[in-house]
Design a protein with these regions (language model features):
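Short, solvent-exposed, polar/charged sequence segments at loop or secondary-structure edges
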Residues: 49-53, 59-60, 66-122
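Positively charged n-region of N-terminal signal peptides that target proteins for export
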Residues: 1-4
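A structural "domain/chain start" motif
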Residues: 19-83, 147-150, 159-165, 192-197, ...
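Bacterial N-terminal signal peptides
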Residues: 6-14
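Short, structured interface segments
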Residues: 169-195
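Amphipathic beta-strand/beta-sheet edge segments enriched in Tyr/Trp
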Residues: 96-157
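Residue-level preference for long, well-ordered alpha-helices that form the structural scaffold
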Residues: 50-54, 123, 168, 172, ...
Length: 212
């Protein structure tokens, strides 16, 4: 009986140890604004603070990093505030890294082909994205990279059957997502290749409050 109890106890300890080792230590990352460095969408009433292309890229990157399960994400939409928060002030929010990005290229292309009994239309979107990873404590850029992505669709009309296809708005998301997907693995590697650390946020009545 004692041997059985000893075996069960050892088994429970092993399972507990395995569960603890299986936990992932997450890095705290602040994502800054993605700027739109292209001419796309910059008309008379263009609002730099609410650029839809930059917001698309930011949302896609945030989603992909969240899906990795390796980060606690802190979204910081004000680039000037991000720059001011390096060093001692950055400890207050406890971020390890800042990720800043830009949409550097964006273009749409429509191509059509007419045949005797059919017409076809090819819609293509190409996008370029660049990112920078900044050490939140030192303010130094530790990594930068860029990538391009493309998405397309083809519609056909046979002898008057089928409507004229308008522009597929989802292609913008798909092209930007394709570009960002090429960068995500390197972002994860660069942000996790250093030992995990935490910050003391405040001391109150002899108790320490630290970032998790």
């Amino acid at each position: 009986m004692k041997q059985v109890l000893l075996f069960l106890l050892s088994f429970c300890v092993a399972i507990s140890s395995f569960a603890q080792n299986d936990k992932t230590i997450k890095r705290k990352v602040a994502i800054g604004r993605f700027s739109n460095e292209t001419q796309y969408g910059k008309g008379i009433f263009y609002d730099k603070e609410n650029d839809p292309l930059g917001k698309q890229a930011l949302d896609i990157l945030s989603a992909k990093l969240a899906q990795s399960g390796k980060f606690i994400l802190l979204e910081r939409n004000d680039l000037e505030l991000l720059a001011a928060e390096t060093g001692e002030n950055m400890k207050k929010i406890g971020a390890d890294y800042l990720i800043l990005g830009s949409v550097t290229e964006f273009g749409r292309k429509n191509e059509g082909q007419q045949k005797v009994f059919s017409n076809s239309k090819v819609q293509t979107v190409e996008a370029g994205v660049s990112i920078r990873i900044v050490d939140a404590y030192t303010g130094l850029i530790i990594y930068s990279d860029e990538a391009k992505g493309m998405a397309g669709t083809t519609t056909k009309e046979v002898v008057g059957i089928g409507g004229q296809a308008g522009f597929d708005a989802t292609l913008s998301d798909k092209a930007i997502s394709a570009a960002i997907s090429q960068l995500v693995e390197n972002i994860i590697n660069k942000c996790t290749d250093k030992p995990w650390k935490s910050y003391i946020l405040s001391v109150e009545d002899g108790s320490y409050i630290i970032s998790g």
